[in-house]
Amino acid sequence: MTPKKMTHYQRHYHITTFGCQMNKADSERMAGILENMGFIWSEDPNQADLILYNTCTIRDNAEQKVYSYLGRQAKRKHENPDLTLIVAGCVAQQEGEQILRRVPELDLVMGPQHANRLEDLLQQVFDGNQVVATEPIHIIEDITKPRRDSTITAWVNVIYGCNERCSYCVVPNVRGVEQSRTPEAILAEMELLGKQGYKEVTLLGQNIDAYGRDLPGVTESGRHQHTLTDLLYTVHDVVGIERIRFATSHPRYFTERLIAACQELSKVCEHFHIPFQSGDNDILKAMKRGYTHEKYRQIIDKIRDYMPDASISADAIVGFPGETEEQFENTLKLVEDIGFDQLNTAAYSPRPGTPAALWDNQLSEEVKSDRLQRLNHLVAQKAAERSQRYLGRIEEVLVEDQNPKDSTQVMGRTRGNRLTFFKGDINQLKGRLIKVKITEVRAFSLTGEIV
């Protein structure tokens, strides 16, 4: 490749992010690195000199969308050879050099563990190299201020990677083993956010309640010295931060000690995202999830014992290989019994490199689509029922932005993570905690008025 010149005009960048909250946090860090290098954000990718796609490989449709976008920009690059084209994230990690066979116009292919190395990798590109960085490494601590999408709420990574081996999931292959940040580093980042005026922090991890298992130290009782529970106590009193959330939790590591801490610590919001994936024990075993539906129900019951009004959200997969109608109905029964405030649902999508993708008992797309539709109908029904409890109540809402569909309204979220709209001036209310009386409820959102 011919060396690229960092000329005066090659200064605009655009990042498109696919997938989970972890990817969004990675994109914010990479944007911060680019701006530290002198790049300027461009809302329009077609006006950018550097385009980065931060990718997701959990579902096949997300992966195909990436290649569609890449195809369009590859054509642009033939017209403008100075365009820098980057694929980051999980597709990059999984495909590695194979991506270059499909899109030889790429300058840089980098896995999620390399996000904080972006400047070094780009320097290699500007020296005329086509770079692939997917080798496993110890994640470099955050060294650049992220370009955060919000001035009110912020993501803070606390643990990277995943040690689970669910039979359907590519995450351990693409994000590597668990690597916990030190409590001191997390506390320092949150203290900075508090000084910068941020009001809410969401602590992030693929399995966040596994935090600290890889850090040294054991207590006299034999448990790990550093756990998510201990971390919540460590960061709770950061000045300026009014709310703390965490996601995503794994049922295997969700303890009563953690639940009790969430009830005790006033800044921790009463909202818990705990995927169950299936309501059938045989399917859970085939998925290698490491728990039963009875164990999952016990966790939710215990949360509601401590915090009766807690909001519960989760993830579920339908149409897993070999799933019978009866097994699917066990998932419906769990959803009916628990009553989730929100449920992210998906039809099973075979992913390369996972055991389940090789099984010969795959279900038809028609069966998976039918089951997904039936589950979604029940989810909306139960969420609407759960919403009724808010009617007439006064809720604390953190105002985040203007309602894009109604400029006379602002919007924000309750402690239970319900999106809430009400009349108000965004210039006066943004970033404030406002008491709102709920006057209208829908399945997944609320409307109210300032008290």
From Swiss-Prot:
Q: Which InterPro entries is this protein grouped with? A: Elp3/MiaA/NifB-like_rSAM (IPR006638), Methylthiotransferase (IPR005839), Methylthiotransferase_CS (IPR020612), Methylthiotransferase_N (IPR013848), Methylthiotransferase_N_sf (IPR038135), MiaB_methiolase (IPR006463), rSAM (IPR007197), rSAM_horseshoe (IPR023404)
| EC annotation from Swiss-Prot or TrEMBL | 2.8.4.3
Q: SUPFAM superfamilies from the entry?
A: Radical SAM enzymes (SSF102114)
Coiled-coil annotated residue ranges, if any: none
Where, in this chain's numbering, is [4Fe-4S] cluster 2 bound? 162, 166, 169
Bound cofactor: record note: Binds 2 [4Fe-4S] clusters. One cluster is coordinated with 3 cysteines and an exchangeable S-adenosyl-L-methionine.
Q: What class of enzyme is it?
A: transferase
Q: Name one Pfam family in it.
A: TRAM
Which UniProt keywords are present, listed alphabetically?
4Fe-4S, Cytoplasm, Iron, Iron-sulfur, Metal-binding, S-adenosyl-L-methionine, Transferase, tRNA processing
| Binding residues annotated for [4Fe-4S] cluster 1, in chain numbering | 20, 56, 90
One cellular component term (GO) for this entry is:
cytoplasm
Keyword Protease listed? The answer is no
| Residues annotated as domain Radical SAM core | 148-385
Query: What function is annotated for this protein?
Result: Catalyzes the methylthiolation of N6-(dimethylallyl)adenosine (i(6)A), leading to the formation of 2-methylthio-N6-(dimethylallyl)adenosine (ms(2)i(6)A) at position 37 in tRNAs that read codons beginning with uridine.
Record note on quaternary structure = Monomer.
Task: Tell me what this protein is called.
Answer: tRNA-2-methylthio-N(6)-dimethylallyladenosine synthase
Query: Source taxonomy lineage?
Result: Bacteria, Bacillati, Cyanobacteriota, Cyanophyceae, Oscillatoriophycideae
Encoding gene, per UniProt annotation:
miaB
